[in-house]
Amino acid sequence: LRACVGKGFMDFFNEVDADVFCIQESKLQEGQIDLDLPGYHQYWNYAEKKGYSGTAMFTKEEPISVSYGLGIEEHDHEGRVITAEFPEYYIVTCYTPNSKDGLARLDYRMTWEDAFLAYLKKLEEKKPVIFCGDLNVAHKEIDLKNPKTNRKNAGFTDEERGKFTDLLNAGFIDTWRYFYPDTEGIYSWWSYRFKAREKNAGWRIDYFCVSESLKDELESAKIHTEVFGSDHCPVELVIKK
């Protein structure tokens, strides 16, 4: 995030004027940055390990309550989840663990996925859920430029894709795909290597998902491919209420 702030972050932040603005992989510790965001409440979840992971949420309306993590010790050392409760719904920001080179963390990733879905369903017992973040998976072949060469790579394994399918089958909507079911060539992440962004050799791994009960409230979804400053670009959801 510190690098982004020097690359137009505040211009974008002010331009979109979001009611809720979420960040994943902030790579910050407490006190390392002081963002001046008039009119916003700021919530940060830091990883115990320095310069790693982390999430943040900035909200215009003060939430009823805010919680950090999943409430499961083995999953809550890396600052990956923030949940804010509002009158009509919960908003959750999530930075899903990367399965890493050689799929070194794939087994851990699978346990995380099950715990995260169970967490969302528990919230949903009380009110609908909107969750967003870097979910570190391209769901279908149209969600990345080079599916054939990435079948066994982190972010496109059958196991990871299957967990995202489970999430949709559990009653959540991938909002961008809801509006654009067949659109190809729109991505949210590009490697810094191989001139990937220049060639648009990207992956769509950043999502807004919502409970099925919010389907009629969906107004628009957007992936801001024109915004630079990171290897990811921002994604946006507009709802009616």
Task: State each model region's role.
Residues K60, A84-P87, S211-E212, L237-K241:
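Active-site beta-strand termini and strand-to-loop segments that position acidic
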Residues K27, Q32-S99:
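Structured beta-strand-rich core segments of catalytic domains in phosphoester-bond hydrolases
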Residues L1, S26, L135, C233:
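Active-site metal-binding loops of divalent metal-dependent hydrolases
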Residues R2-E15:
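Short, acidic/polar
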Residues G71-I72, T96-E113, K148-N153:
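Surface-exposed cleft-lining segments at the edges of enzyme active sites
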Residues D17-V20, H41, A115-A201, I205:
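Metal-dependent phosphoesterases centered on the DNase I-like endonuclease/exonuclease/phosphatase
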Residues K50-S65, I186, R193-D216:
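Conserved beta strand-loop-helix elements of the APE1-like EEP
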Residues K222-K241:
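Surface polyanion/phosphate-binding segment centered on an Asp-His-Pro turn
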